[in-house]
């Protein structure tokens, strides 16, 4: 219902610097005016939009002062929801905030449902559906590049691309249906429409091609550190984390289980997994660790194969490399600081061992080469494609990907039917379905149950 006024806590519950209670709806200003006494100046109902007022929240029944607050007023349509919005900035105590919220609810507001503020922004035309989902992507972003992609969506770059494709598609549909309804006046459909349909399909394919990178931005890159025992895998993990997370020892087999930590590497969120050294062992506990390492490697998006530059390439290193050749790899020569002699030979051996795989020499102990490693990770993930300023927005949402895949299926079917000379009404059925799937992304054809599912993922105050 858009004819009532909603309220909710817009900041995390508990103690903090401030707590913000947000109201939206036609009665938002009037409701707060009944419980807000400004320190000076006129009543809140005459306050100009986008201004702050200092005062006290007073219970009109008991006359008790509940908190000293700052109240901001944003009048429709120039607000997040395109409705009148009031935000009450309370002191950050849980009790004071709760009492103010309860008073607001007793005075005429209704407690908002999860995501209802953003849903109102969508229903009032302030945001389309892809932009509304971008709000949640911004909140959940775990990397700088993920945040950049989410902001790109919020600015409407994805929506514009989808809208352009949909507009061209509906134009072809209009021509096709006019040809069916008025064959004598309109004549046959221009063959150029088929060529444009192929271009629309290519545009959908370009968007789908960004999904893998988009998935890594939202889910994080699974990175396994592997190698024979005692090559410095745990030291590398500690160096990347800049903390002593894993036990480091000269005794082979010290790491007997996988250790997982999250960090930023090359602008991406990486779920870094330090694995037990890969070798044949009679030790039961170490064998369990090796088995878990193999499972982690199988699930990894990227594998860092670590070798010891000090001791040089060993047969065991070659066996490790052979066991992971089906993965995306970076070869890391560690302990560069301990190579006192023949450094050029050691690096040449590393190059020969790595072959066509990217390689980098590092000193986990001294922190040398880690920036180069981050760049290698970035190059592999982006594949030479720069995220910022790209013409093609990234697909980071699994719902968008599914809609595009369904759209593609119907476009391909329509093109095939057109090429085979099948009846125009059959072609139109596929084209309408393709257009509906594009509309689902930006919300022009979204069903109520889909909206319920999307906005239920939001917190109550958003």
Curated annotation (Swiss-Prot):
Keyword Hydrolase applies: yes
Domain TrmE-type G as annotated: residue spans: 220-382
Primary enzyme class: hydrolase
PROSITE patterns, alphabetized: G_TRME
SUPFAM superfamilies tied to this protein: P-loop containing nucleoside triphosphate hydrolases (SSF52540)
GO-annotated cellular components: cytosol
Disulfide bonds: none
Positions that bind Mg(2+): 234, 255
Record protein name field: tRNA modification GTPase MnmE
Organism: Moorella thermoacetica (strain ATCC 39073 / JCM 9320)
Lineage, top ranks: Bacteria, Bacillati, Bacillota, Clostridia, Moorellales
Gene that this polypeptide is encoded by: mnmE
């Amino acid at each position: 219902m858009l004819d009532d006024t909603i309220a909710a806590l817009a900041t995390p519950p508990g103690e903090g610097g401030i707590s913000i209670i947000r109201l939206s709806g036609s009665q938002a200003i009037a409701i707060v005016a009944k419980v807000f006494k400004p320190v000076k100046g006129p009543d809140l109902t005459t306050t100009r939009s986008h201004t702050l007022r200092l005062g006290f929240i007073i219970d009109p029944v008991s006359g008790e002062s509940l908190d000293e607050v700052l109240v901001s007023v944003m009048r429709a349509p120039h607000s997040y929801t395109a409705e009148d919005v009031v935000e009450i900035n309370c002191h950050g105590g849980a009790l004071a905030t709760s009492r103010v919220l309860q008073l607001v609810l007793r005075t005429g507001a209704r407690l908002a449902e999860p995501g209802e503020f953003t849903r109102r922004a969508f229903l009032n035309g302030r945001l389309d559906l892809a932009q509304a989902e971008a709000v949640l992507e911004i909140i959940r972003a775990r990397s700088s590049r993920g945040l950049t992609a989410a902001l790109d969506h919020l600015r409407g770059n994805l929506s514009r691309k989808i809208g352009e494709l949909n507009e061209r598609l509906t134009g072809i549909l209009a021509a096709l249906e006019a040809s069916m309804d008025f064959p004598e006046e309109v004549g046959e459909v221009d063959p150029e429409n088929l060529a444009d349909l192929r271009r629309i399909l290519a545009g959908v394919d370009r968007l789908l091609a960004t999904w893998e990178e988009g998935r890594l931005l939202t889910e994080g890159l699974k990175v396994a550190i592997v190698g024979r025992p005692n090559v410095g895998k745990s030291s590398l993990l500690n160096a990347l984390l800049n903390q002593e997370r894993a036990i480091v020892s000269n005794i082979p087999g010290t790491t007997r289980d996988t250790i997982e930590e999250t960090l930023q590497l090359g602008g991406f969120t990486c779920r870094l997994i330090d694995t037990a050294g890969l070798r044949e062992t009679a030790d039961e506990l170490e064998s369990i660790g090796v088995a878990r390492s193999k499972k982690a490697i199988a699930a990894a998006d990227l594998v860092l194969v670590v070798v010891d530059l000090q001791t040089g390439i060993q047969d065991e290193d070659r066996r490790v490399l052979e066991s992971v050749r089906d993965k995306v790899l970076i070869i890391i020569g560690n302990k560069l600081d301990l190579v006192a002699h023949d450094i050029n030979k050691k690096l040449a051996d590393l190059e020969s061992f790595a072959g066509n795989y990217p390689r980098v020499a590092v000193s986990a102990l001294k922190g040398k080469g880690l920036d180069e490693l981050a760049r290698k990770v970035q190059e592999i993930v982006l594949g030479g494609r720069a995220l910022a300023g790209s013409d093609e927005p990234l697909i980071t949402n699994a719902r968008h990907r599914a809609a595009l895949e369904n759209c593609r299926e119907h476009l391909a079917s329509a093109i095939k039917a057109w090429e085979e000379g099948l009846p125009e009404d059959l072609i139109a059925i596929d084209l309408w379905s393709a257009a509906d799937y594009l509309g689902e992304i930006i919300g022009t054809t979204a069903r109520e149950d889909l909206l319920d599912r999307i906005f239920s993922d939001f917190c109550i105050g958003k």
